Amino acid sequence: MPGPRIYERHEVDELIISLEEILLDLDNHRAQLQELKIRINALEMIWGEDLRESSCADHHEYKSHMAEMEKIQGYFKSCADKIGELGGQVKGLNPPLIDFYGVQDGHLVFWCWTRGEREIGHWHHIDEGFTDRREIAEQP
């Protein structure tokens, strides 16, 4: 089985527009999810545990909101899958942190990208994370 795809920095730079589009769509769904959570919390405050009983007047609305939340959470996974299809590894969603395998000074590293960066300007070793990232000019 072949190993992971290794990217040149410029190849990842070319994917940033696609990453931003996926994340924008994710933001829209995140806002919907937040609204659903607010509605569910309000219903829970009004009805308490009775909300889960089919005899509760707002039970159907509650179930509908819960189903929609599950659907949106599934959509989050599909967004992560889309990023994976581009070769990225999602390391965080808020803020979005995405890594791509690369080579820096002969070492296997992650090119490290977060939202708002127009190009890959940072990297970190594969056993490190975002807080350990270095500017491209820095040596290991």
Task: Please place each PLM-identified region on the residue numbering.
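Residues in flexible loops and secondary-structure boundaries
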Residues: 14-15, 34, 48, 91, ...
